[in-house]
Amino acid sequence: DVEADNLLEDATRIHCLSYTSDGKNYQTIFDYQEMRDFILIQKGLIGHNIVRYDVPLLEKILGIKVKARLFDTLPMSWVLNYERAGNKHGLAAFGEDFGVPKPEIDDWENLNPEDYAHRCVEDVKINWLLWRNLLKRFLYIYNNDKKLLDKFFRYLEFKISCAASAELTGWKLDVGLARQCVDTLTTRKADKVVELKTVMPKRKVTTVKTKPKVCFKLDGSVSSHGDRWFNLLDEHKLPRHYDGEVTVVKGWDEPNPNSSDQVKDWLYSLGWKPCTFKYNKNKETGEENKVPQVRKNGELVESVKLLIKIDPAVAVLEGLTILQHRLSIFQGFLDCERDGYVKAEIDGLTNTLRFKHKKPLVNLPGVDKPWGEEVRGCLIAPEGYTLCGADMTSLEDTTKRHYMQPYDPAYVLEMSQDGFDPHLDLAKHAGRISQSDIDNYNQGTRPDIKSLRKNFKVVNYSATYGVGAPKLSRETGMNVREAQALLDAYWERNWSVKAFAEAQ
């Protein structure tokens, strides 16, 4: 483990380097030349985020090139500890688990070297325990086949080194275009808010009235306070002896399109039936709270879009939603920009070992979406360079075919033919479209099938991981019966997926 005076980009000094080779004896180095001599003779180094921080830092400050094999316990934890929250993969969190508290330090420039060394050693202690824990579990998964496990570790090292290289290189940002888009969208957003205020219902402002202490004068006649109270009861058709609270309308405020509650109240008044929810689980009680969602991934959910037919004013909300989302992207570019570049950082791995990305380069709209060309256009190549990209076709589906082949070779052969679309094939198998419809779609004469394909794509991928009808219903907006029908069609067609899973 290494402690420095700042994060990688701004670090100018390494305070110390601590290490152990047996989990019992811990050493700390303060001298730069001793660090060089130590690092350059190592065949393997184990560290937490060592690929993306410690090694780049050592190479930057010491002017060396580390050639040792790198075993990074951070991505290893992402792989095995997939149920841990994103912020629970750090050494501080594991220190709590292992009973080795991570020392806190707020000043990274002026403390004694021993203070930094103490923290550094404790980090090494925590990481030693984490490494032993991870290694034991990996060996169990790989049936103690160390050669096979080493292949996986090499792959993981390569993958994270690619991420480290991307983060170090950065992505050149067209700052001028980003600022121009922020200015334009800010103006348009304000206009949309004003427009939406004219179509949303005004908000009722209420106050609570209570019975006055004195309703009658000494002579028995009604007091002025009593008179107002009894008139209020008459207005609300309440008996004169009523002495509870009365809610009255105080006035009407202009609607606030930025208020989630007010927007939802408006949609409910139009007959909105939510289909997309966010589920918040109470950690203490285990109870799940279902929160209706108006937006998802920067767009209105399908159940809200349906209301445009009932009230075209909902289209204004759709426009505002897109503007807000795109504005946040461009603003994120500018917030994260440094010397004309933004970082393509990662924040974890999915269960298929894909990267989870961090702001600002995450979930960017395609060029076929509103403002997609401008968003992508902000990411440019330096002078003399060309941007290029590569992707694998149907990575998960291809992996699935590999395991299905021994059980259902005929279906795998069919899926391997040029032009085969697993999502449209499932739609055909479910009776939603015909082969001629698919042919017309491929020829560009049935673009309307694209939305249908999108739903069946969700089914194809989520069903493989055991999704149930209720959750699929929430994800697609269809009812539970329709979702179950699609799942039935999927498993009838992909029975071999269960077969090879059960055989493991």
Identify the residue ranges that each predicted region occupies:
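Metal-dependent catalytic core segments for phosphate chemistry
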Residues: 12-16, 396-433
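Short secondary-structure boundary/capping segments
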Residues: 14-16, 60-62, 269-274, 359-365, ...
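Short, amphipathic alpha-helical "recognition" segments used to contact nucleic acids or chromatin
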Residues: 453-465
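Conserved "right-hand" nucleotidyltransferase catalytic core of DNA-directed polymerases
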Residues: 3, 102-105, 113-373, 380, ...
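Short, Lys/Arg-enriched anionic-surface-contact patches
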Residues: 440-453
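Cytochrome P450 catalytic domain signature, combining two hallmark sequence patches
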Residues: 65-68, 190, 272-279, 404-417, ...
